[in-house]
Amino acid sequence: MKYIFVTGGVMSGLGKGITAASVGRILKNRGYRVTAVKIDPYLNIDAGTMNPAQHGEVFVLKDGGEVDLDLGNYERFLDIELTSSHNITTGKVYRTVIEKERRGDFLGETVQIIPHITDQIKTCIRQAAEETFPDGTKADVCLVEVGGTVGDIESMPFLEAVRQMRGELDEHDYVLVHVTLVPEDAMGDLKTKPTQHSVKALRELGLHADIIVCRSERVVGANTKRKISAFCDLPLSAVISAATARDTYEVPMEMEKEGIADVLSTHLGLEKKETDPSWYRLVTKEYTNRVTVAIVSKYGIEDVYISIKEALKHAGRALSTEVKIVWLDAERYEPCSLKDYDGILIPGGFGKRGIEGKIGAIRFARENKVPFLGLCLGFQLATIEFARHKCGIADATSEEFGEGSHVIALLPEQESVTELGGTMRLGDYTSDIRDKTLAMKLYGKSQIIERHRHRYEVNPHYIEKLEKEGLVFSATNKNRMECLELPGHPFFFATQFHPEFKSRPTRPSPPYLGFVEACRANKRTT
């Protein structure tokens, strides 16, 4: 197994995840099997209970793992499915070591950061790297992104584990890529001093960067590269410019042009294979149409809904249609403005804030024949809206929101749950699709597997009344409602699951593909 460790310096939010995913895509384009691990140096066990406004989207894996959004980037760029073991947190590591100590596994030793914590970190990395793909094969290369910034106290045990692994691995099985900021001053000059200090901090920990990826707003020129090469003691070819791209899927192509593949091949002893051009053709595909979609949401931060944004992009690219997204605050938007959009999307979420605005948008889409896609909470609110305005249940609501007729109720198995973390209905579940429905048209098969993250469901006591008034539940998991739709509407479709988590640039999610196609067919904007 060959390992590529990715660290970051100067500041957080530089794009280490996109850099790591892009490196993986470059190697995959050359025929190598690639997997990825994300290290998050926080004490949380996982990302499930973290505030999305601070941390961004909680991405859900097939096994129900609630993880950092970077794992979503890995899955999309590499077209793989990861598991919870591919996300290593300080909380997981410490919990495991403490459990071992309580069992007596250390035979009376004094348990310390070194060697016990670092040994557990190395074990977690190796176990994740060795997991097999569905076809029974294993990865040739494992990417390991170390979250945080070099110098942070939280990252120290992980960086020490990386240092130890360098000594334990063959010289051609290890490479360290350091992502750093090259800012522009008021005169427009690119400054290398932050990079120099970042590399110095890395060296103080016993680590040496084999490749430096320079993040900047514009291309880093030859003179700046030479300066970084000289001061950071590595070949000029190992200084890679990574300017901010218009589209993140273009980053692998830009890094390929910088020659990073050849540098990696030399360090890792990889055969230099021809590059598969299919990624280039996909990313450079031209748009011939454009639609505008309103996303009525609770949070005004795009990273909270990054998988939705990417799924719309995947569908648009497949249909040669550029999808422009307009974010509407569910509590503040003007209802009359909804007529200006080709489609309306209601994303998932939790809590009561903003739900009436979302319900109003759903009603507008239903009554005015505007293409609508609802996801998770959007599915539940579509049920509530229909119950209120078509079934005459004026106080229809969800048990999550308070008193009223609970057309949305708590899942029975949730009634005994006392902890928040990792206790929802999470991960892959199978749904059976009814024949002659929109769901069947979208998926083209009678059984599907999609990822879930919820505690509430359609109350079985109201299903008959809802269906009598025309609502169709077109997919179910046993007695649970998974999809709903409205016959006679151009596109009114909602899912209890999150189809965006399985969308890929090469394989768009069927509900998103159908939604964008309906937006294009019912275009209102210019």
Curated annotation (Swiss-Prot):
CTP binds at residues 12, 152-154, 191-196, 227. GO terms for molecular function: ATP binding; CTP synthase activity; glutaminase activity; identical protein binding; metal ion binding. It holds the Pfam family CTP_synth_N. GO terms for biological process: 'de novo' CTP biosynthetic process; pyrimidine nucleobase biosynthetic process. SUPFAM superfamilies: Class I glutamine amidotransferase-like (SSF52317), P-loop containing nucleoside triphosphate hydrolases (SSF52540). ATP binds at residues 13-18, 70. InterPro entries: Class_I_gatase-like (IPR029062), CTP_synthase (IPR004468), CTP_synthase_N (IPR017456), GATASE (IPR017926), GATase1_CTP_Synthase (IPR033828), P-loop_NTPase (IPR027417). The keyword DNA-binding does not apply. L-glutamine binds at residues 349, 377-380, 400, 455. Keywords: ATP-binding, Glutamine amidotransferase, Ligase, Magnesium, Metal-binding, Nucleotide-binding, Pyrimidine biosynthesis. The active site is at residues 376, 498, 500. PROSITE patterns: GATASE_TYPE_1. Mg(2+) binds at residues 70, 145. The keyword Signal does not apply. Residues 1-270 are annotated as: Amidoligase domain. Catalyzes the ATP-dependent amination of UTP to CTP with either L-glutamine or ammonia as the source of nitrogen. Regulates intracellular CTP levels through interactions with the four ribonucleotide triphosphates. Homotetramer. CTPSs have evolved a hybrid strategy for distinguishing between UTP and CTP. The overlapping regions of the product feedback inhibitory and substrate sites recognize a common feature in both compounds, the triphosphate moiety. To differentiate isosteric substrate and product pyrimidine rings, an additional pocket far from the expected kinase/ligase catalytic site, specifically recognizes the cytosine and ribose portions of the product inhibitor. Belongs to the CTP synthase family. This is CTP synthase. It comes from Methanoregula boonei (strain DSM 21154 / JCM 14090 / 6A8).
